[in-house]
Structures are given as C-alpha cells and as structure tokens.
Design a protein with these regions (language model features):
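Structural motif
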Residues: 114-124
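Flexible, glycine-rich phosphate/dinucleotide-binding loops
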Residues: 65, 115, 186
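N-terminal export and membrane-targeting signals
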Residues: 1-17, 231
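Serine-esterase "nucleophile elbow" of acetyl-processing enzymes
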Residues: 29, 33-107, 126
Length: 294
C-alpha cells in the first residue's frame, strides 16, 4: 500500500517528524510458542491441515513488511504480523514456533509496493525454503492506484494469484498456504480522515484512487470510493475461490476485511498502514485461522 516518489518522501518526513518525532521498535520476542493467554485447539486426526507448521515464509506487500509502523516511510519487519520478533506484536511465527525457532525458521520475502503480479517472484523465493507454511497478504496495491481505471482487473488479479500458487506447488507441493483477505480500504479512509495530519500525508500521493480529496462527499467522490470498495471485494472473492481449489490452502474467510481497524490500529505516520497495534491484531487473526480445526 505504498506509492510515493522521492519528493513525497522528503515532504512526508519533514511533516511527520515535526509533528510527532521518530519512534523506535521493540524487537524482542517471547521465548515460548503461542501467546501467553492463548491455548491451541486439540489436534484432530481427521484434518489434513497441519496446525503446527515447523517453518514459515511470508509473501506480500508493505503490510507484511511493517511499513510506517515504526518510523516514517520505512519498513519495520520486526513488527510484521507474520514473522516479526517484537513482543508488542507476538507475530504468527513467534506464536507457532516460539522466539528461538521463529528467528531460525521464518523468512519474510514481502516487498513494499508489490501487487499481485509480483507475488510469483516472492513465491519462488519462499519455495526454496520448503516451508511448512506460506502466508499471503496482497491486493491492496492493486486497488491503490493513481485512478480507478488503473486498478488491476479482476481477471488479471486471478491470473496473478493462480500463477503464484502454481510456482509454489512446482517446488514445494506440500507447503500449506494461509491467505489473508485484502483489508477494507474504505474503512481505513473513514477512520484516517478524522486526523488532519493524515489527510495532509494523503495529499502527497498515498492511494489516490481512494484517498484523493479525502473530505469530498459529493456523488463523484462517493462513486469513486465505492468503485474501489467493490474491486477489493471482488479481489477477496478471487482469493477465496482460488484457494478453495488447493487442499493445502486456507483463506481467512474475510476476517481481515471484516476487522474494524480504529485509529489505534493505524500508523500515526500515514493513518493508512497498520500500526504496531494493528500488526498485532493481524497476527491474532492469522493465528486463530491457522490453528483452527476447520
């Protein structure tokens, strides 16, 4: 969910540094598998899904890289919901593997700014590890374009996802895949627009198809945002359908899309990407879905 040029980077850095000051990240994880107050469901011999994978690789975009969660216009993978080591997040990898094994047996191949068409390259990298589980969170950048006309078509989105899974299956046929739904971008607009600084950052080119003229509520602006919303919902339908055809793939059932991100879960740098708190909520959702009996 990132799209800025060098001039925008400089402008955002000056703006956010002046208002907030740069913050850091806690990169120390817990030493035991699973969150403190969370108990895994009892194993079931009838399920083909392994709820305790021994290694994890992550693919996707800036959300999985922890972009803007720790400081302005910077990736912060230590707070990634999928593979981060921060105790403030308690990532999926740490919950499943514990701190020590997560550091040795989890890899983050996500790239900020990636769209679905870029996922095959990341999957090829992940496949070389033959991980027990690959996490996928991609699609926001396909909707976040300069205009609604420039959004990735549903057909191309489907082809990109199918190709990415095909690449993985050729090299790692037994690897399981957890697919997170694309977040409800329109809700992020609704929450973020309440912050004056956030709207100033948005003017510098963040997700123009949705966030341009953030305060405009006329028919044209409403129709534009509805178009983005409908495309995101179509992307999620594709993720569900394609994943259902792979017996080792598990879609989150729209859990990320349905999650009601509030201002505490949004980056205080751009009011659009997940904050550290938001990353923790994504980790909770993923852990619940990966360890679910069904």
């Amino acid at each position: 969910m990132r799209k800025q040029g060098h001039r925008s980077r400089a402008a955002v850095a000056l703006l956010t540094a002046a208002v907030l000051g740069v913050t850091g990240c806690d990169a120390v994880g817990g030493d035991s598998a699973g969150p403190t107050q969370t108990r895994k469901p009892s194993p079931t011999p009838t399920s083909a899904w392994d709820r305790s994978p021994g290694s994890i690789a992550a693919v996707g975009d800036s959300i999985t890289r922890g972009f803007d969660a720790c400081s302005v216009l910077t990736d912060c993978p230590e707070v990634s919901w999928a593979t981060g080591a921060s105790t403030k997040v308690d990532s999926l990898a740490v919950r499943l593997l514990g701190k020590t094994k997560a550091a040795e047996r989890s890899w983050n191949y996500a790239v900020s700014g990636s769209r679905m068409a870029d996922l095959s390259t990341q999957m090829a990298q992940a496949a070389t590890r033959a991980p027990g589980l690959v996490t996928v969170m991609a699609g926001a950048n396909d909707a976040c374009r300069d205009s609604t006309a420039a959004m990735t078509s549903v057909t191309d989105f489907r082809a990109g996802f199918e190709d990415a899974l095909s690449v993985l299956r050729k090299k790692a046929p037994k690897t399981q895949v957890y697919v997170a739904s694309v977040p409800n971008l329109k809700r992020l607009w609704s929450e973020g627009r309440t912050n004056p600084m956030g709207k100033q950052v948005w003017k510098l080119g963040l997700c123009p198809s949705l966030l341009a003229d953030a305060d405009a509520l006329d028919a044209a602006a409403t129709a534009r945002r509805d178009t983005v919303q409908e495309r995101v919902e179509a992307y999620n339908a594709v993720l569900k359908e394609v994943c259902a055809k792979d017996e080792r793939c598990r879609y989150d059932g729209g859990a990320v899309y349905d999650y009601r991100f509030g201002t505490d879960q949004l980056s205080h740098w751009d009011w659009f990407h997940p904050s550290v708190n938001g990353q923790a909520r994504l980790a909770e959702i993923a852990y619940r879905k990966v360890t679910s009996v069904t």
